[in-house]
């Protein structure tokens, strides 16, 4: 794998809430990462303009808002996300088949085969474990529930999933290779696990078949964030 291919796999999590911080990170890291993740805090604080800010610096955007509502509401929100030109955006697989299928149908009707952002389904959050699932009445092991949701998403026409790297081989087996897998819960060896329970190193995650890796604090909190991103790229290349 080349350095450019490895770099393209890295999604930097913009865990900030100010335009000035977004501009700083977009300027600093655009040469070193493949995409920027805009989550709920940043989008609520700054709105769609933050997407345009990143695009101005040549950056691609993963709009991580995890839509979960009635089918029509999610479909219309997803349509607006796609119209903004983001590369990836997502919804919750727990919203069910109808919600996901309606979203895909709406996007297909609008774009008519033209290139659009890929829609991903969130399976089980990486902060969750068996106890978390049991608390909401789900009595399946995490890996089994993840695969069940991933298969449902593929059946509905969704482009891929967001899932823990540990579940990547199971998802590949159930859904095939033409299905995107984005993995948070990725931490290089020099970083602490923070609040995510199911984690893996970047090299391990890519080796297991992940297409994109969401990485935030290990880059942002490093003394030299650009060098940290470069070190992660080197780790992926080395395998």
Swiss-Prot record:
Keyword annotations from UniProtKB, A to Z: Decarboxylase, Lyase, Pyrimidine biosynthesis
SUPFAM superfamilies hit by this protein: Ribulose-phoshate binding barrel
Active-site residues (renumbered): 66 (proton donor)
Matches recorded under Gene3D superfamilies: Aldolase class I (3.20.20.70)
Domain of life: Bacteria
GO CC terms: cytosol
Catalysed transformations (reactions): orotidine 5'-phosphate + H(+) = UMP + CO2
InterPro entries: Aldolase_TIM, OMPdecase, OMPdecase_AS, OMPdecase_bac, OMPdeCOase_dom, RibuloseP-bd_barrel
Alphabetized Pfam families for the sequence: OMPdecase (PF00215)
Keyword Cell cycle: no
GO molecular function: orotidine-5'-phosphate decarboxylase activity
Entry EC number(s): 4.1.1.23
Pathway: Pyrimidine metabolism; UMP biosynthesis via de novo pathway; UMP from orotate: step 2/2
Binding-site residues, substrate: 15, 37, 64-73, 126, 187, 196, 216-217
Gene Ontology BP annotations: 'de novo' pyrimidine nucleobase biosynthetic process; 'de novo' UMP biosynthetic process
Oligomer status and interactors: Homodimer.
Function, in words: Catalyzes the decarboxylation of orotidine 5'-monophosphate (OMP) to uridine 5'-monophosphate (UMP).
Family of the protein in this entry: Belongs to the OMP decarboxylase family. Type 1 subfamily.
NCBIfam families: PRK00230.1, pyrF
HAMAP family for this protein: OMPdecase_type1_B (MF_01200_B)
Listed name of the protein: Orotidine 5'-phosphate decarboxylase
């Amino acid at each position: 794998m080349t350095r450019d291919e490895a770099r393209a796999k890295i999604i930097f999590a913009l865990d900030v809430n100010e335009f000035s911080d977004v501009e700083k990170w977009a300027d600093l890291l655009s040469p070193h990462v493949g995409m920027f993740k805009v989550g709920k805090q940043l989008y609520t604080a700054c709105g769609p303009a933050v997407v345009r800010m990143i695009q101005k610096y040549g950056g691609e955007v993963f709009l991580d808002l995890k839509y979960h509502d009635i089918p029509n509401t999610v479909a219309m929100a997803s349509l607006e996300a796609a119209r903004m030109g983001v590369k990836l955006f997502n919804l919750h697989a727990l919203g069910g088949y109808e919600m996901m299928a309606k979203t895909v149908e709406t996007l297909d009707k609008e774009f008519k085969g033209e290139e659009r952002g890929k829609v991903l389904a969130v399976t089980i959050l990486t902060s969750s474990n068996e106890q978390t699932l049991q608390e909401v009445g789900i009595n399946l092991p995490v890996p089994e529930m993840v695969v069940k949701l991933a298969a449902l998403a593929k059946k509905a026409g969704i482009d891929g999933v967001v899932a823990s790297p540990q579940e990547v081989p199971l998802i590949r087996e159930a859904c095939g290779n033409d299905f995107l897998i984005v993995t948070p819960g990725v931490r290089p060896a020099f970083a602490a696990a923070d609040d995510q329970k199911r984690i893996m190193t970047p090299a391990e995650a890519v080796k297991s078949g992940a297409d994109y890796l969401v990485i935030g604090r290990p880059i942002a909190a490093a003394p030299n964030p650009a060098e940290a991103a470069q070190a992660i790229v080197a780790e992926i290349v080395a395998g």
